[in-house]
Every structure is written in C-alpha cells, then in structure tokens.
Amino acid sequence: MLSISKTKMDFLEEGRWKDPFDELLDSRTKLSKMNIVKQNVRVTYNIDSSVENSSYIEIKEPNHKNEPLTLEDCSIKVYCPSDSISTPCDKRLGGTTGLFETDLSPITRLKLEGVEDSRDKCADTNEADLYVNVEILFQNINSSPKKCSNFGKKRLSNLNKMVTAVHPSISLNPGKWRKSLNNFIRSKITETNFTKKVERRSSICQDRKSLVLKGEHKFENKYEEDVLKYCHQCTPLPFNTAYEQHKLLNTKKIGEGAYGEVFRCSRNQEVLKDHISDIVLKIIPLEGSTVINGEKQKTFSQILPEIIITKKMCSLRTSKTNSTNGFVSIQKVSLVKGRYPPHFIKLWEKYDNEKGSENDHPELFGDNQLFAVLELKFAGSDMANFKFLNSEQSYYALQQIILALAVGEEEYQFEHRDLHLGNILIEYTNKKHIVCTFKSSNLTLLSKGVNVTIIDYTLSRVTINDCCYFNDLSRDEELFQATGDYQYDVYRMMRNELKNNWSSFSPKTNIIWLSYVIVKVLDSVKYKSINTKVHRMYIDKIKELKNIIMTFESASHCANYLFNLN
C-alpha cells in the first residue's frame, strides 16, 4: 500500500476537494501562505481560448518525514501548452463592446496523486514498470490506446494488482471545443459488396497525417493541386502582394484559435468592385514543420474538406430546387506563401496588448510558409452575445435556422453536428422577408429585423458527388466525458443516435441540436423587452415548439410541419 507522510496529508487537508488548477487560482491556499510566487494567470478574451498558462506544483519528498515542507521542497513547472485544452469563451465577431469574458475551464484528466506520467509507448499495460513519485500533478493523459504511462522513482511491490485508468467527467462552460478534431474522412458511397467497399479509394486524416487505404501514395500532391484548383491558382501567391495594405480598409484582428488568426476588414471598392465590402479573413498556416499555437500545422488534406464544405453550403444561395442564404458566404480562397505582412503583425500586436493573445507571434513564420486564407462575408455577432428585441425576433430566427438545416439535408444530406450558439451568427437587417426554396417550393419568412447565418463545419457531415465527408469522433472520448451544460449531453445523444458510426446520415442529429438551441433561446439569450405582451406570447410559442421538437426525425420533417408543406 502506498503511504504518504502526515506532513503531506496536512498540506492537502484544506484543499482536498480542489484540483491543483483550483489551488493555483486560490490565494488562500497553503502555497500562498508559504509565499511561493505563482505565475500570472491571464483571463481569456479570445474567440477560441485555451488554458495556455496552466501549470502544476511539484513537491519533492523531504529527506526526513517529520520535517515540514519548505520553499526549496516546491517548484513551479509550466505545463506544456500543446496539451492544454479548455472550453473557449463564446465567439464574438466584431462589435463595439468588449469581448465576452469567460472563466478558465481546463479540459484534462486529473492524474492520481503519487503517479508521474510520461509519453513512452509500451505494448502491454501489465508489462509496464510501475513506480511511486510523490507529486501533485495536473497533467493530460493521452487518449491514444497505444500509449501508456511509465512511472519512476520507487517500485511498487505488488505488480499483480489490476491497474485501471479513471476517466472523470469534465465540467465545462458552453462554447467551442478547442481541441483540433482532424479526423476528416472522405469515402466513396457505393452499393457494391463488402470486399469492394474495403478496396474503395478513400483517405483518413488523423493525428496530422494522411493515412491511405489504397494506392494513394501521391495523394498529398493531389491535395495541394485540389486546394490550388479551388483557389483558382496555379501556384501560391506572395502573401505581401495578395493582401497589400492599400487593398484593405479598416482592418483589425477580431479573434483567434489554434487554427490561426481572424481579421475583419473592408475591401477597397476601387480595387475590387465586385467583392463584398465587409469581410472576415481566416488565415490558417499549412504544411509547415514548426509547431504553432501548441499544435502541428494543418495539411492540404485537412484544409481541403473545410474548403469544399464551405463552398458547397454557400452554393445553396443559388440552387434552384433547394436554396437558402442561411450558410456563411465564402467570397474567395487563396493559397499564399511568405512571411506575415507587417501591417497584419502590427494588428496582431495591438490585439495582444489590448486583450492578450494566446497564439504564437506570427513573426515565427519564415519565407517558405504556406497559408490558406478564407475570405468570408461578415455576418454579425454570435447568438450568445446578440441582444434580441423580444422573443418574437428569436422565434423567427429559429424558423430561419430550421429551414436552413432542412435545405441542407435535402441537397447534401447535411448534418451540422456542432450547432452551439457560437456557430449561429445574427445581424440586423432592413429586409422584411427571408426567401428560400425548399423541395422546389418558394417560401417567404418574416425576418422581424434579423438575419441568421450558420458557420463552422468542423464536425459536419455532408454527401457531395457520391462522396461522404465527415469527422470521425468515435475515438474522441474527452468530448463525450464533458458535463456542465446541455451542449455536452447533446454530443452523447448524437453518439447514441449514430451508434458511434459517424459516416451514417441521420438527420435526427439536427433535431437534437435544434432542441438545444430552443432551450438556450428560452433560458440564455439576451432580450431588451421582456415585460411586453408580445414577448410573453412568443415565449409560449417557443415552449410549444420545445415540447414537440424531439418528435421530428429531421429538420425537413419539422419544416414540413411548421409551414404546412406536403
């Protein structure tokens, strides 16, 4: 049996219900009383924030068990940012007010006291050497089944006891899951027998590598060619030339994530008269060997599905049988090469000085660095931060969301699979009506002064030209262990609905997410006027929709009911 000295137990007594991260943030802990200087912990303001300043305390075992702990017995170790994950604050694309402020919420597993984790691989857990190390740890246990821990210092006497990993639930705030989910799979849909299905051409993007199932050793070159094709380019453009300062007006950085940087600007209409004036530039580094923002850079094979899905969902604006403006408009995609332009660096530094950036300084990029730049139409504030006039506005916003999903289902077997409030953008509009086409029928909705846009297809599933694109979440256990908000119940409900087969088309997942959005419209979104008769009347309508939403099998089914369609 592992024994810990009474001195150490006394040290843990006051904070025995707190994890080490809480102790770092609590000024009343014993560490503070010992005058140990803690690192500054920065409150996060960014669109996709993570706990980049997480650390843990290592307590060396005293030479004499009865001697009290001293300052020399403790040291601060900075935890690796690449393994530090958190739920982010809600997205905020623009606006004049300050960005939404959120508490730090680390997403890691808490290691048992007295055990040290390393990244060494071993073939069998029973054959691993087990040791004791007296430490208080805050570490991330890698979810890969091929990796296990190798512990040091004091060997346990009994190796016959079963050692099991404990996966505690993780309490989080609602928002975007920061951890990169690069498990996009493209598979050919075919009705042939099982043998032929195994041999079909497909590729799996996982762990930042392209895993090939059949004869695609040259696929990386083909992915680059495909990206260039969607960019309408033959070769990468010089970064400085493609985005010269005089071509962009009122540029400012509005957010960031592990994927890269987000800038908002206006196009110089004299230079490009046919372009949208108010745009968002999403700049994503590609194919470099340098680890950026704690993660490996995306490959061509990983950025290609995002480009394809974004373009296809945008194309629904002009489709004849099923059309909607409810998905974000992508104006242009560019592949550029070279160092970050100086004017972008100045904007990055201004953002860092005012709000604090968690990303690496873009001066790290060299002359040969590649970037994908997605130019998207600015579409307003996310639903979590938007303030509705009353529930009448939010009710008609719900109708826009339902119809957009229904159109996506009909045209591309679309499932969003991550429709939290940060992925729904809303802006005011002077248009009285929203027009769309559903199953060749023209529909006109009242806008009530708001226009809704759905964004972010990281977890989405679509069928395009007999190919299915989806993100395989079957091995991402951390996502399904999270608690603290209905959002994380929805991920588990999706997994049950799909039976963990993420390639299958099950539009019920859209209904599950609609139930989540309806709950948030009732409980979380902001309203200006809540004491009016109109507000109370439409709150009742939204409650009625909440009571029946789970009876529908798809957004199409729901739209048929709401708009009395056949």
Swiss-Prot record:
- Active site residues per record: 418 (proton acceptor)
The organism that produces this protein has a lineage beginning with: Eukaryota, Metazoa, Ecdysozoa, Arthropoda, Hexapoda
What is the protein's quaternary organization?
A: Interacts with pds5 and vtd.
Q: Which organism is it from?
A: Drosophila melanogaster (Fruit fly)
**Single GO cellular component term:** chromatin
The UniProt record lists the Protein kinase domain at 248-566
Please list which residues make up the signal peptide. Answer: none
The record's gene field reads Haspin
| Phenotype reported upon loss of the gene | Viable, however adults display a decrease in survival which is stronger in females than males, and both sexes display a decrease in fertility. Loss of phosphorylation of histone H3 leading to reduced centromeric cohesion. RNAi-mediated knockdown reduces the size of salivary gland nuclei. Also results in a strong decrease in chromosome-bound pds5 in larval salivary glands and a significant decrease in chromatin-bound vtd in mitotic and interphase embryo cells.
Q: Which family does it belong to?
A: Belongs to the protein kinase superfamily. Ser/Thr protein kinase family. Haspin subfamily.
* Matches recorded under InterPro entries: GSG2_C, Kinase-like_dom_sf, Prot_kinase_dom, Protein_kinase_ATP_BS
Q: Tell me what this protein is called.
A: Serine/threonine-protein kinase haspin homolog
